[in-house]
A protein has these predicted regions:
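Conserved micro-motifs of the catalytic ATP-binding
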Residues: 22, 26-29
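Short helix-loop "hinge" at the ATP-lid/N-box region of the Bergerat-fold HATPase_c
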Residues: 45-49
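Glycine-rich ATP-lid/hinge loop adjacent to the conserved G-boxes
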Residues: 50-51, 93-103
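Acidic ATP/Mg2+-coordinating residue in the GHKL
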Residues: 75
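Short conserved segment of the HATPase_c
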Residues: 80-92, 152
Length: 157
């Protein structure tokens, strides 16, 4: 994937395994912004790697049902404090981890959330401090087509 290539040097330098599975799903979205969002999430995974663990990984996978496709990015980094989780998408919020790692601006996940909102998708995050962080981007199916069909039925377009 383009995201793995873009982050190749950082992944190698930090000895992080990058795995992609079941990611052959087709979603209708803006490819440039999608790549930007994934880069933000992967950069966070790299930045917040748990240096005490012998093996570090970032796993990207997708799952599909009738209503949506969910892209999941999972890492086994340092995790996020439960008290910080509700605010990770807030502008300029860096939380405890951001204070410990001076590279944090608090803008990455904020921008990811704003882009998801604009593109009609949803982003969510779950984490356990010291264990993992899981980011999910949900792409809803047929919203665009449903809108057009509804408009056609009412005689307007």
């Amino acid at each position: 994937s383009a995201v793995a290539l873009k982050n190749k040097d950082d992944l190698l330098e930090n000895n992080i395994t990058f795995e992609v599975s079941n990611a052959d799903k087709l979603v209708l979205t803006d490819a440039k912004w999608m790549e930007f969002m994934l880069n933000q999430i992967v950069n966070n995974s790299i930045k917040y790697k748990d240096k005490t663990k012998t093996e570090s990984y970032i796993k990207m996978s997708a799952a599909e049902d009738k209503k949506c496709i969910v892209l999941e990015i999972l890492d086994n980094g340092i995790g996020i404090n439960a008290s910080d989780l509700p605010r990770v998408f807030d502008k300029s919020f860096t939380g405890e981890n951001g204070h410990e790692y001076s590279k944090a601006t608090g803008m990455g996940l904020y921008i990811v959330k704003k882009l998801c909102d604009k593109l009609g998708s949803k982003v969510s995050i779950e984490s356990v401090k010291g264990e993992y962080t899981r980011v999910k981007i949900t792409f809803y199916k047929n919203d665009f087509y449903k809108e057009i069909t509804d408009s056609n039925e009412s005689g307007s377009m």
